């Protein structure tokens, strides 16, 4: 009798956790790879530094992340790979190289980087389980984005990419 009530309690707790809405938790459907992340927390962290970052951007007529050309038209099967490469770009070249004397901004960027590392870890698991295939379309789109990034001076590219983080976050929110 005790075993059945314990099993029922555990089952009830599991259902409660699965069906209770989590604040800010978003399921990203990236082809065969499905992960959950707190995009609202990332967006809130970025919104606190967005104005100061974008104020440093002197290249207002150039875009690195183009909604139609590079992100929005990405087929579901290629989203995982494209996101994996974009996270690597932000982790290896943007967050690490952003220069500012403002310690508050640097702490926020560190927090954003930690959030991206968590997502990247989940994407690595998908890649290990062969559910994050890198097709020609994903590689072509990433090459276009990287080309736009590399056309700018290194620090200008870092500022531009960080200032466009909201475009990437919007795309991630819209993956369904």
UniProtKB/Swiss-Prot annotation:
Higher taxonomy: Eukaryota, Metazoa, Chordata, Craniata, Vertebrata
Protein family: Belongs to the IL-10 family.
Pfam families, per the entry: IL10 (PF00726)
Protein name (database record): Interleukin-20
Induction: Up-regulated by UV-B irradiation in epithelial keratinocytes.
Annotated localization: Secreted
Tissue occurrence: Expressed in most tissues and five major cell types: epithelial cells (primarily skin, buccal mucosa, tongue, nasal mucosa, lung, ureter, breast, prostate, fallopian tube, and adrenal gland), myoepithelial cells (mainly prostate), endothelial cells (mainly in small vessels or capillaries), macrophages, and skeletal muscle. Isoform 2 was detected in the lung tissue only.
InterPro entries associated with the record: 4_helix_cytokine-like_core (IPR009079), IL-10/19/20/24/26 (IPR020443), IL-10_CS (IPR020423), IL-20 (IPR020442)
GO biological process, one term: positive regulation of epidermal cell differentiation
Signal sequence bounds: 1-24
UniProt entry keywords in alphabetical sequence: Cytokine, Disulfide bond, Secreted, Signal
Role description: Pro-inflammatory and angiogenic cytokine mainly secreted by monocytes and skin keratinocytes that plays crucial roles in immune responses, regulation of inflammatory responses, hemopoiesis, as well as epidermal cell and keratinocyte differentiation. Enhances tissue remodeling and wound-healing activities and restores the homeostasis of epithelial layers during infection and inflammatory responses to maintain tissue integrity. Affects multiple actin-mediated functions in activated neutrophils leading to inhibition of phagocytosis, granule exocytosis, and migration.
GO molecular function term, any single one: interleukin-22 receptor binding
The keyword Signal is assigned to this record: yes
Quaternary context: Forms a 1:1:1 heterotrimeric complex with its primary high-affinity heterodimeric receptor IL20RA/IL20RB.
Entry GO CC: extracellular region; extracellular space
Disulphide connectivity of cysteines: 33-126, 80-132, 81-134
Recorded coiled-coil stretches: none
Keyword Cell inner membrane: no
């Amino acid at each position: 009798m005790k075993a059945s009530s314990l099993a029922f309690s555990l089952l009830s707790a599991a259902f409660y956790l699965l069906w209770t809405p989590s604040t800010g938790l978003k399921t990203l459907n990236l082809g065969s790879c499905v992960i959950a992340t707190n995009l609202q927390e990332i967006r809130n962290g970025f919104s606190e530094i967005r104005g100061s970052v974008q104020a440093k951007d002197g290249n207002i007529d150039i875009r690195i992340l183009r909604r139609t050309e590079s992100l929005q038209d990405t087929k579901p099967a290629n989203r995982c790979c494209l996101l994996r490469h974009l996270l690597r770009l932000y982790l290896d070249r943007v967050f690490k190289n952003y220069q500012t004397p403002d310690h508050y901004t640097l702490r926020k960027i560190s927090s954003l980087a930690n959030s991206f590392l968590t997502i990247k870890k989940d994407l690595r698991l998908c890649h290990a389980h062969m559910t994050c295939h890198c097709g020609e379309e994903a590689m072509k789109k990433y090459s276009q984005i990287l080309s736009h990034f590399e056309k700018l001076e290194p620090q200008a590219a870092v500022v531009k990419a960080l200032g466009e983080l909201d475009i990437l976050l919007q795309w991630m929110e819209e993956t369904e």
